[in-house]
From Swiss-Prot:
Its EC number is 6.3.5.11. One of its GO terms (molecular function) is cobyrinic acid a,c-diamide synthase activity. The lineage of its organism: Bacteria, Bacillati, Bacillota, Bacilli, Bacillales. This is Cobyrinate a,c-diamide synthase. The gene is cbiA. It comes from Halalkalibacterium halodurans (strain ATCC BAA-125 / DSM 18197 / FERM 7344 / JCM 9153 / C-125) (Bacillus halodurans). GO terms for biological process: cobalamin biosynthetic process.
Amino acid sequence: MQPRLVIAGTHSGVGKTTVTLGLMAAFVEKGNIVQGFKCGPDYIDPSYHRAVTKRASRNLDSWMVSEDVVNDIFIEGCNGADLSIIEGVMGFYDGKASTSDKGSTADISLLLQAPVLLVVDISGMARSAAAVVKGFQQLNEKVKIAGVILNGAGSERHAEMCSEAIKEACGIPALGYLKKGDVPSIPERHLGLVPALERGEHDSLFSQLAAVVSRQFDLERIERLALEASALSRRTNLFQQTKRPSVVKIAVAYDAAFHFYYEENFTLLRQAGAELVYFSPLRGEDLPSHCDGLYLGGGFPEEFADELSQWIKDHPQLKKRVQSGLPTLAECGGYMFLGEQLTTTKGKTVEMAGVIPMVVQMENKLVSLGYRDVTPLDDSFLLSKGQQIRGHEFHYSKAVYTETERPAYFVKGLFGEGKEGYMSDHLLAGYTHLHFASEPAVATQWVKACEVYKNRRLHRGQVSQ
């Protein structure tokens, strides 16, 4: 059994995250082991999920990876959990195109045969709420909208009126409601959000959400709905292959400045024979001297520019190690970190690692957002020329090269295409967050490159510690 629910919304901003976190917190308080998932490529909401459930949340994205792999990511993630709660993205039917459900929350709910709770903002309406729900039921009659959550109620009586209308016209119950002002607003998705989550600064918010949801939601009926979901079977052997004994160590920067990683990337690397060794530049920790590879993920280096600049001064071996051939993948924030300088939106410029001949300028507006089809322009330790992988891009900065650029990828998105990133024989870096499950061979290729580096290092007498 894999008890599960999808929390969907009529539109962005309707309260999906509030309801999701409230349910997670309430079920955790009841003693349940709760697993979080997020539809789409977003990293921020999974950070919330992790803060509440104490389990790594996983992304379910039917554009970046195949439907079979989405199915298996879900099965892999919910292992050991009593209940899985899947937070939707945008409106229920919003996906890759305006005429298709592909990539939408509805798409994921059908793929996983999961019952759906639809969050509806009932502000300023009564019976009309039933018309809204009816439309969502009828647009694709294959989906299973099993109940609704009413948000923005003016009073308990207002929620009752809408509930009665929906039950009569749509045949499904309202299983909970939130009145205006019931709970504090979820903090904006600003740069300091994840560090604040890691410090536990929002724990009181989660407790308030749990209290309100426990009082105003029918948790027993919601749990019964989740238990009605039929068991899923694995469709691939992607996460079932015999794990190779660890043969190399890959250092992974992991702290408030570097924390945007897809969990499947870690899973596939371990399966291929890598031991992941985590270190935190923000805590002043050294790059592990015994590592055979380096993974610098995304995050918010601009938020910690001074601290990272000082770490680079105190740890010059990072530049030396990367330039000496350490197989290194740097994505988005990690890419920025390896540049020569970073200039904040306030005009302050700090020195960065100086590995890549570029300067990074932070902007006050979004520079790039969207899915990417990625094709490497040449052979590297991770990808062969022409080998394809998929990923996602989201950043507020621009990279300006100070020498001739050596772009890593040709990337194609919905609204354009072009070259991006930087590469050498042992370094692959760019703004795109790569999803290894879209091309699983990359994990094996990286581990093989690390083995070559390790053997060369040992031959030079640098014995592994």
